[in-house]
């Protein structure tokens, strides 16, 4: 059972959680968790690379304000995409970039998983909205807890960090698709084919 006193880093696995937390006014709550937040470069670019997008400026400011509490993880995939975006491209490179942008988040996350390990704790929390994320993390070589944004809000409310977190998130559900409250505890000692995909969160 996770507690507020634990210090598992929180991996934001795709753009969905940050956008929804920003829309709900909950970004500031993350500071109260006193944990490192891990953002892969392609996820950061998706949520804050274009400041004209909804909540991008808010998220970019939050990242800067959090300072070293946010681990901005670089990947070869992210560096390659950034290099292509920054230079004048041939028509062929435009096609390559368009294809890369479609799959780059998943590829960068996979690359990141292959080399990253939690440093101060033995496990990690992974928050996601993209259905492609859980299968990637089933192969992790360290224990972790996979959860959707709805579960995350319920947990931080149960810890007393923000007793209005669930209501704030549910208030934006008519504008932003939210996955149900799902969770899975991944035991790295289990064979990969025995590890469960996220199921309903019962609040325990």
Over which residues does each language-model region extend?
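Short beta-strand scaffold positions
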Residues: 13, 127-128
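Feature 3881 marks metal-assisted phosphotransfer/nuclease machinery
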Residues: 1-11, 21-22, 27-76, 83-91, ...
């Amino acid at each position: 059972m996770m507690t507020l006193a634990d210090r598992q880093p929180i991996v934001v696995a795709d753009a969905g959680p940050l956008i929804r937390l920003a829309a709900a006014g909950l970004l500031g709550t993350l500071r109260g968790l006193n944990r490192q937040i891990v953002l892969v470069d392609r996820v950061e670019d998706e949520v804050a690379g274009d400041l004209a997008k909804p909540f991008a400026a808010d998220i970019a400011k939050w990242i800067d304000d959090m300072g070293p509490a946010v681990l901005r993880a670089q990947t070869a995939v992210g560096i390659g995409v950034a290099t292509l975006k920054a230079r004048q491209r041939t028509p062929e490179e435009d096609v390559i970039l368009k294809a890369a942008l479609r799959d780059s988040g998943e590829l960068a996350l996979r690359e990141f998983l292959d080399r990253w390990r939690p440093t101060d704790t033995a496990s990690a929390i992974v928050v996601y909205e993209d259905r492609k994320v859980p299968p990637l993390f089933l192969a992790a070589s360290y224990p972790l807890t996979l959860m959707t944004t709805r579960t995350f809000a319920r947990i931080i409310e149960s810890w007393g960090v923000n007793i209005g977190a669930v209501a704030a998130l549910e208030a934006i559900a008519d504008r932003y698709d939210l996955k149900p409250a799902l969770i899975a505890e991944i035991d790295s000692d289990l064979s990969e084919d025995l590890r469960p995909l996220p199921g309903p969160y019962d609040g325990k």
